[in-house]
UniProtKB/Swiss-Prot annotation:
Keyword 4Fe-4S annotated: no
CDD domains per UniProt: IgC1_MHC_II_alpha_I-A
Tagged with keyword Signal: yes
Annotated stretches, region: Alpha-1: 24-111
Transmembrane parts of this sequence: 219-241
GO cellular component, one term: external side of plasma membrane
Organism of derivation: Mus musculus
Protein name, entry field: H-2 class II histocompatibility antigen, A-K alpha chain
GO biological process, alphabetically ordered: adaptive immune response; antigen processing and presentation; antigen processing and presentation of exogenous peptide antigen via MHC class II; antigen processing and presentation of peptide antigen; positive regulation of T cell differentiation
Domain Ig-like C1-type per the UniProt entry, residue ranges: 114-206
Length: 256
């Protein structure tokens, strides 16, 4: 099936599943829960069913394993969610998509170029475990490949990827995580592939290590420190002598 058809179906799925969320920009609230966000597109039977709170994912339904996956295991102890509910919503989305496809004018969707940023989770210390985060925004349609490279070689160990998060403009964003141990010998890239890009985009990251001081710089710093110390000694000595002289003059007996 050509790419344009896949894009048509992606846009129809998005319109069908999210049209009921309209008008949210007019509502002000301290907290926002998005329950049962369902996205389905074809070909490939691609879909997801998620629960979000204040933009953070609480859980999603694994469509292949047919089970609920909680972002934090502790949440599963507080409540339960039967994955069958999510699977039913996906089936409904697929059915609606097929109907809308037959009634559509087959206008191709527009591929948006996603934007990627790479940053560490914590301040970087060489030899200390850390996590790299690749944040990819402005994704549409929600089909994307995110790959980690270390020294230009693909990395699969320690990689975790979130589901798609829906933005207010109905584009999507996604995060990919890589656990690693920073080393001054390693460089990393987050590789992003999407229909909106003419070629894959690589977002580069490497630890910023302060350059060592040269011998000349060390000599200059030591000389400046020594000079400041000598000036301090001289100035201090002058003040002490002046103080002694002033004290001697005040103690000299005056005329009777």
């Amino acid at each position: 099936m050509p790419r344009s058809r896949a894009l048509i179906l992606g846009v129809l799925a998005l319109t069908t599943m999210l049209s009921l969320c309209g008008g949210e920009d007019d509502i002000e609230a301290d907290h926002v829960g998005s329950y049962g966000i369902t996205v389905y597109q074809s070909p490939g039977d691609i879909g997801q069913y998620t629960f979000e709170f204040d933009g953070d994912e609480l859980f999603y339904v694994d469509l292949d394993k047919k089970e609920t996956v909680w972002m934090l295991p502790e949440f599963a102890q507080l409540r339960r969610f039967e994955p069958q509910g999510g699977l039913q919503n996906i089936a409904t989305g697929k059915h609606n998509l097929e109907i809308l496809t037959k009634r559509s004018n087959s206008t191709p969707a527009t591929n948006e170029a996603p934007q990627a940023t790479v940053f560490p989770k914590s301040p970087v210390l060489l030899g200390q475990p850390n996590t790299l985060i690749c944040f990819v925004d402005n994704i549409f349609p929600p089909v994307i490949n995110i790959t980690w490279l270390r020294n230009s070689k693909s990395v699969t160990d320690g990689v975790y990827e979130t589901s798609f998060f829906v933005n207010r403009d109905y584009s999507f964003h996604k995060l990919s995580y890589l656990t690693f141990i920073p080393s001054d010998d390693d460089i990393y890239d987050c590789k992003v592939e999407h229909w909106g890009l003419e070629e894959p985009v690589l977002k580069h990251w490497e630890p910023e290590i302060p350059a060592p001081m040269s011998e000349l710089t060390e000599t200059v710093v030591c000389a400046l420190g020594l000079s400041v110390g000598l000036v301090g000694i001289v100035v201090g000595t002058i003040f002490i002598i002046q103080g002694l002289r002033s004290g001697g003059t005040s103690r000299h007996p005056g005329p009777l």
